[in-house]
Amino acid sequence: MKVELVFIPSPGVGHIRATTALAKLLVASDNRLSVTLIVIPSRVSDDASSSVYTNSEDRLRYILLPARDQTTDLVSYIDSQKPQVRAVVSKVAGDVSTRSDSRLAGIVVDMFCTSMIDIADEFNLSAYIFYTSNASYLGLQFHVQSLYDEKELDVSEFKDTEMKFDVPTLTQPFPAKCLPSVMLNKKWFPYVLGRARSFRATKGILVNSVADMEPQALSFFSGGNGNTNIPPVYAVGPIMDLESSGDEEKRKEILHWLKEQPTKSVVFLCFGSMGGFSEEQAREIAVALERSGHRFLWSLRRASPVGNKSNPPPGEFTNLEEILPKGFLDRTVEIGKIISWAPQVDVLNSPAIGAFVTHCGWNSILESLWFGVPMAAWPIYAEQQFNAFHMVDELGLAAEVKKEYRRDFLVEEPEIVTADEIERGIKCAMEQDSKMRKRVMEMKDKLHVALVDGGSSNCALKKFVQDVVDNVP
């Protein structure tokens, strides 16, 4: 019997790339499987994401939905797509029903698209989650929901406290100041609870992580700590799109510059597709870079206004000489390069890169570890504060810039991270013979081994496919 899955990624380049990479892995792992990937258009113009789904392939096809009103918040925007998604699923189900040897086996929805689970129920299909973050954070979501539903404990009341609490998927006490903004906000907290409850109602959760990277979390999910009412969790990572994309001329120029730099001599600063800073913060970064004495490749963009629910992407600074310290560009011309867009995978793969100052998006963390590059953690939004704690305190794979920093639509006025804090994080991450660098190299090996035939993630992927077949109604 042949089976087909429908994938629904969240809009945005990171989620679409990860979902596409997972879909490709699945169809390559089993000839019985086909995937239809329904692409919800990004709320912002994003050429990088459109390049992912330009061509359908054998047993993998893309259906791009027409754009809708893009001025609302992400949750409302995704919900507005349900009628279009329902129509596509109906057509796919109809097409599959005409083939006697095929069955529509289920829908795999992104962790932010849980409202689409209703569509699976309407068509009597199994629903699965693709959790594009880590297993430890998934455990935090379940734990926060359990605290509220079973003990009437609301973690949003921990805002602005120094409180720490135990999370079953972590070995270290977790500081409330590193909770994501949505968990600390009374308005958004019910949404957090609803998502966790929705996760429990599915047949399984695919997590973009590796068993050897998060043994505490995977032990918890396997039932080792008596947890109940959680579906099977499959650690199938690292799921990454390592293909080059974007402006080819800029890419060549950047890589040519890197080739001229000594091995492990360059600190790379890049903060994701939505990462930008104010003029004042950019000046602090510049001061820190110059003081550190290290060569640098800095992806610098201007932050969008705070408090905007539509969350527009960062823009460009029109005149760097006006916003950076006087003479900075002249003094660092031989050791530094400032860019707007960065071919991140290619840069991290360069022998010249010694450390990565990152916003701690999960894709960026996995890419950094895949190439064996130590990190300096500077989170900005979403679950990145948790990820920073996870990398710095739990696993010792990153130095800290400021792990509780945040700049998102719920923050009225972001604080300024000082040059001293930035310099300290850079110097620590760039240290050549550190224990942290050794741990990063060990983790690199674990990530690579997980994907080979017989590796933990390879086995988890095969187990998922078999469970999908077994769950066909």
Swiss-Prot record:
Query: Where along the chain is an anthocyanidin bound?
Result: H15, A382
One Gene Ontology MF term: flavonol 3-O-glucosyltransferase activity
- The positions flagged as active site in the entry are H15 (proton acceptor), D110 (charge relay)
Can you state which reaction this protein catalyses? Answer: a flavonol + UDP-alpha-D-glucose = a flavonol 3-O-beta-D-glucoside + UDP + H(+)
Pfam families referenced in this protein's UniProt entry, alphabetically: UDPGT (PF00201)
What are the record keywords, sorted? Glycosyltransferase, Transferase
Gene3D superfamilies tied to this protein: Glycogen Phosphorylase B
Ligand binding (UDP-alpha-D-glucose):
T132, A342, Q344, H359, W362, N363, S364, E367, E383, Q384
The UniProt entry, under InterPro entries, shows:
UDP-glycosyltransf_plant, UDP_glucos_trans, UDP_glycos_trans_CS
**Enzyme Commission number(s):** 2.4.1.-, 2.4.1.91
* Function as written in the Swiss-Prot or TrEMBL entry: Possesses quercetin 3-O-glucosyltransferase activity in vitro. Also active in vitro on benzoates and benzoate derivatives.
The family assignment reads: Belongs to the UDP-glycosyltransferase family.
Name the record gives this protein: UDP-glycosyltransferase 71B1
Give the species this sequence originates from. Arabidopsis thaliana
